[in-house]
Amino acid sequence: MDTKHLIASEIQKVVPDMEQSTILSLLETPKNSSMGDLAFPAFSLAKTLRKAPQIIASDIAEQIKSDQFEKVEAVGPYVNFFLDKAAISSQVLKQVLSDGSAYATQNIGEGRNVAIDMSSPNIAKPFSIGHLRSTVIGDSLANIFDKIGYHPVKINHLGDWGKQFGMLIVAYKKWGNEEAVRAHPIDELLKLYVRINAEAETDPSVDEEAREWFRKLEANDPEATELWQWFRDESLLEFNRLYDQMNVTFDSYNGEAFYNDKMDEVLELLESKNLLVESKGAQVVNLEKYGIEHPALIKKSDGATLYITRDLAAALYRKRTYDFAKSIYVVGNEQSAHFKQLKAVLKEMDYDWSDDMTHVPFGLVTKGGAKLSTRKGNVILLEPTVAEAINRAASQIEAKNPNLADKDKVAQAVGVGAIKFYDLKTDRTNGYDFDLEAMVSFEGETGPYVQYAHARIQSILRKANFSPSNSDNYSLNDVESWEIIKLIQDFPRIIVRAADNFEPSIIAKFAINLAQCFNKYYAHTRILDEDAEISSRLALCYATATVLKESLRLLGVDAPNEM
């Protein structure tokens, strides 16, 4: 139990009619440590208890008896709590040393499934930095939900269907070279895609020709299907090589095409529930009662189905297959209206489980303030970017520690981790400007900074030949170690908050804070001095390293023992 919950439960024993959540929301951290570690203002109880806040505070302070507190005192209308730092430090350190990497593991999910729609790059287009956010946010959320007892199901809903394949087929038939595509599939397909889009801007017939080829593809035309399958196979090989490098795995690669034969059922269900309305020859579902102005366009006048029809089929399939407790879609902010429509249509179909579906939006990655666009050829490709990040990490490692073993492996962990961490430390709904130099820096709020703090602690533990033991009586009450203890004690709650808000940045910011606190402690403390507290200081180091490593793991980032 963290200190806030400990205090809230003690106050509730004295004031049982007050909800613990209310008490928690009222607790304050005094500006001056001489006023205690936490304070409870009694103003809100004055009306119900019909007493002055000062008297209420005094009554509460007198009735609280716990060996977790050095003292509890009333100062005016406030109850000030002074925690027994030595006792709490000992408890926290023993818990982490006992649990190891399992520290802060919880069973909130009770093994229930969480379906996570993530990554979902478009076939025949390069894997760009734009796809990175969905990939790393989804992967981190999977780790976070797993940590609190859910079973994550990671779904790569590949963009392997749509009019863009009509465009690509037209481009390939006009200018394509089979040998060139086989040698460098993604590069060549991107060139074709950019070229055909440029031509379409001045020649309207290109769009019509692309639509015709896509209609052929929907009708299983052999030539169209063969080209589509080839584009898909080549792209997947490329993507999987990158996923391996990023250490990201999936449970399903069922993309848009997988649902081609599952959309008729959606149309039949909508018709049977009398939800389809004709509008200008198209079939729509009105959603005004949900405050959604524009109806959901289910089927166009030419008979072509739409993105939402496919997503309805996917939602039904996932509920039947995984019986999810939560289904989350890690997709950009720009798709918010689409997901509101998707949930509303399912609600209209009387599927109350649609309440368990959540769009987890995120902001854009820009470069020099400019939006990235594959269509316009303004794109940062992930593969060369990762390679450059690894090279930059290798250069810094060479300068810091030229005799390091496994330099290449460490550089890989630092370079890849730097890109992931920089993305995940940003509040999800905000965008960020891509800056590789800032990402790979060992200074500031970066992945390498946190990794280096972990490696520094491992070096201390190796020098001391420390092995964790629960038999020792650890006791620390200095200011710097107490700041670390409070953070470590808070880690279980931090993980739950990250899950509740679908927000990995909460973990990333926690890791930065913990690394900063340790570095401050390291600068002020002679950790290896042979005195009565050495085992306690080393236990604190071990616990800090354990929690730093686990924080990084939840973000999908490795923590090397040496850098």
Swiss-Prot record:
Annotated Gene Ontology cellular component terms: cytoplasm
EC number(s) per entry: 6.1.1.19
Keyword line: Aminoacyl-tRNA synthetase, ATP-binding, Cytoplasm, Ligase, Nucleotide-binding, Protein biosynthesis
Pfam families, A to Z: Arg_tRNA_synt_N, DALR_1, tRNA-synt_1d
Single GO term (MF): arginine-tRNA ligase activity
UniProt motif ('HIGH' region) ranges: 121-131
Annotated Gene3D superfamilies: Arginyl tRNA synthetase N-terminal domain (3.30.1360.70), HUPs (3.40.50.620), Isoleucyl-tRNA Synthetase, Domain 1 (1.10.730.10)
Localization (cell): Cytoplasm
Origin: domain of life: Bacteria
Broad class of the protein's primary localization: cytoplasm
Biological-process GO terms, alphabetical: arginyl-tRNA aminoacylation
InterPro entries in the cross-refs: Arg-tRNA-ligase, Arg-tRNA-synth_N, Arg-tRNA-synth_N_sf, ArgRS_core, DALR_anticod-bd, Rossmann-like_a/b/a_fold, tRNAsynth_Ia_anticodon-bd
Catalytic activity as recorded in UniProt: tRNA(Arg) + L-arginine + ATP = L-arginyl-tRNA(Arg) + AMP + diphosphate
Uppermost EC category: ligase
Cysteine pairs bridged by disulfides in the record: none
Record text on subunit structure and interactions: Monomer.
Family: Belongs to the class-I aminoacyl-tRNA synthetase family.
Alphabetized PANTHER family for the sequence: ARGININE--TRNA LIGASE, CYTOPLASMIC, ARGINYL-TRNA SYNTHETASE
UniProt-recorded name of the protein: Arginine--tRNA ligase
Organism: Streptococcus agalactiae serotype V (strain ATCC BAA-611 / 2603 V/R)
